[in-house]
């Protein structure tokens, strides 16, 4: 199963880096739920995931995710990503700063029948907000 999951994660990374709706429907179950820090309620299905990507791309039109490492157990994956992009649009109400970001994210996925059915997304929003100048550097 771990080779299958690795292939699915590769498809997922291609999906998030392109926001391709066809790939969304291939890799994301319509019954999927996504827990993200920017929404009080879980997002659902491919449409929910596309809305997350839309929010990110509205603030960082060139954003790209690099999958750094995974830990796979049965049908579950812990994944560490690096997100990079330029803050060239409004993000969470913060106007474009023109600053580049490089932010870590740790996400947890569950797969069923070759598709994502659950994700807990944990991007380092504190670091992101500091990097775009919305918060002062700490320390």
Report the location of each language-model feature.
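C-terminal and inter-domain tail/linker signature
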Residues: 1-139
């Amino acid at each position: 199963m771990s080779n299958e999951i690795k292939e699915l994660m590769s498809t997922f990374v291609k999906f998030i880096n392109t926001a391709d709706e066809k790939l969304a429907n291939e890799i994301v179950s319509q019954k999927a739920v996504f827990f993200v820090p920017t929404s009080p309620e879980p997002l659902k299905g491919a449409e929910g995931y596309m809305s997350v990507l839309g929010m990110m791309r509205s603030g960082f039109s060139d954003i790209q995710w690099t999958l750094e490492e995974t830990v796979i157990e049965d049908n579950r994956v812990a994944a560490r990503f690096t997100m990079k992009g330029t803050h060239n649009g409004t993000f969470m109400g913060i106007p474009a700063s023109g600053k580049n970001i490089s932010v870590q994210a740790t996400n947890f996925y569950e797969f069923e029948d070759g598709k994502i059915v659950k994700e807990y997304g944990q991007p380092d929003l504190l670091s992101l907000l500091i990097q775009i100048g919305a918060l002062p550097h700490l320390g």
